[in-house]
């Protein structure tokens, strides 16, 4: 899977909307590190979860 995110992108996790808006911090292969406003830093496997850019 090609990851179409860049550091600074604002995203939401559609399966965890209560996490709030997140900002992409880094991308390493398929792992996207996002700092969400309600739960802090999470590492997302982009092969399993498609984040939605806002």
Describe each region flagged by the PLM.
Residues 2-54:
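Basic/aromatic-rich interaction segments and small domains that mediate binding to polyanionic partners
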């Amino acid at each position: 899977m090609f990851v179409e995110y860049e550091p600074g992108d604002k995203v939401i996790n559609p399966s965890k909307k209560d996490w709030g808006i997140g900002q992409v911090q880094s991308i390493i292969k398929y792992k996207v590190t996002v700092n969400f406003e309600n739960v802090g830093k999470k590492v997302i496997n982009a092969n399993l979860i498609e984040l939605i850019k806002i």
